Amino acid sequence: MLDFLGDLKRTHMCGELRASDAGANVVLMGWVNKRRDLGNLIFLDLRDRSGITQVVITADAGAEVHDRATAVRSEFVVAVIGHAKLREPNTVNKNIPTGEIEVIADELRILNDCKPLPFTPSDTVLANEEVRLKYRYIDLRRPELHRNIELRHQVAIAIRDHLNAQGFYEIETPFMTRSTPEGARDYLVPSRVYPGEFYALPQSPQLFKQILMISGFDKYFQIVRCFRDEDLRADRQPEFTQIDLEISFPRPETVFRVVEGFLKAAFSTIGVDLQTPFPQMSYDQAIRLYGIDKPDLRLPAMADVREAFAAESLETLHVDAELPLVAIVIPKVGELSRKERDEIKTLFGDRKDAKVFEDIKRLEKSLPDAVAKIRELAKPNAEDLVVVVAGAKRPEAANAVKSRQQAYGVYFAAGQLRLALGQKYAERHGAYKHGNFRLLWVTDFPMFEWDETEQRWNAAHHPFTSPHEQDMDKLESDPGAVRALAYDVVLNGTELGSGSIRIHRQDIQAKIFKALGMSPEEQQTRFGFFLEALQYGTPPHGGIALGLDRIVMILAGAESLREVIPFPKTAKAVDLMVDAPTPVSERQLKELGIAVVGKKDL
């Protein structure tokens, strides 16, 4: 028989009681975490979000209370009325904050029972992830997930408080808007009132936040849900949360200082004092030093060692003297076995654009002077692994774009190998331990990227990013050399956020659209409302968006975004708990004027 709560009021959370509460009358409510029956004594570990308190049911409580305690099982919801008592010294549990105290029950109410569990919500033995996602409400009872969701709350509050103190307005933007694809596919919402027409869920509030600057709000922010119908990847979510902001009249450094401030506040929630300002490097520097536009600073940068080799040496090694030649240093790896050297070649792969010399010690006999110079340039310690990557012989570049691509190809190959070696020898170098947070800004990204398949230029960030003033004259003559006033904030090789100074002049925005192959008619169809808005006194403005989910994942030391999102989708974009997506009724489809075409008919 289940009990009603009635007018009973909780006096304490389960994790609050301390030795100083001994003798107090208490009312606790929560879930039975564990039950131990010793006959005349029954122990219940009672749990809520704050922690666990041990409840003791003695013979003095009476037969009715004892019978109720005998009936309860794990995850039953109960209320306990009793008094706090100090534990005997030899029974103190030093592993929990309430370990000096226990509650002697005078009354026990069973507020709800619990079916046999599909799995035990424990951090020590995890059930299959699909089962846990189906029964997410049970999985969320795990202490680790509780800590992660609490951390998410604390991070969001810290960011909000900081931005509010800096004079930002939190302003909501629409979830039902028009489709303006920004790279990924939109999630479309059909209109019943206007058959055949659709709203789209926003991939970001990009245009709305720019319009807020046109409207004179000066400083905007929002912690906002965004939606992207992307191709499925292992750790992507179709809906995700951004920390979105925009500022009027900024320089890039204006945005940097704001972001550094709220990230410092966010990291303080786990007791980390971030050092600000973060270092900066250009996109070109990042590629040359790290072989990637998201540098991981925890390992040494790559070194340009081309000057270590004489021309005849390069010819002997069958590498291209005109292409980069870089050394990768991985600390504390020690002596490699032959098998490990072979594994480096396997990690590098069979590439046509670059080749690898898996350990410079193997070059010492044939090229001692070159190896000595490499050591001078790369500055390794005695136990460090040094690997050299060079450009393979290739046809002459057809133009400046091809030449840049070939050079960058070598850097990219070296950067990929550097990361692979960093992971392979992580236990030896120890740089990846949780808590080693290295942040930086990457600036001056290319404005455009060449699409070899489509034979046209695409926006590297998005088409509303402003080019550098000094590069305006290259928009038509050499688009690949145009730098954008774009910037990313990067942590340990992960992009936390991306932003830019925006285009605030209608004539420049039209030029960018033209460079992207957009006709005047297409510009009006897709962005006519925005091009018109730009003509009504638009101030210079810029901003950024950072992924809240990923920030919390990193702070929590979690392995997956699904560990920090209360109700995530699977890698196949399915919500197993509510079984979505699902078909809808023919009546609903008819109201919307939609006919579903089966896969076989596509």
Indicate where each model-derived feature is located.
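Class II aminoacyl-tRNA synthetase catalytic cores and aaRS-like
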Residues: M1-L602
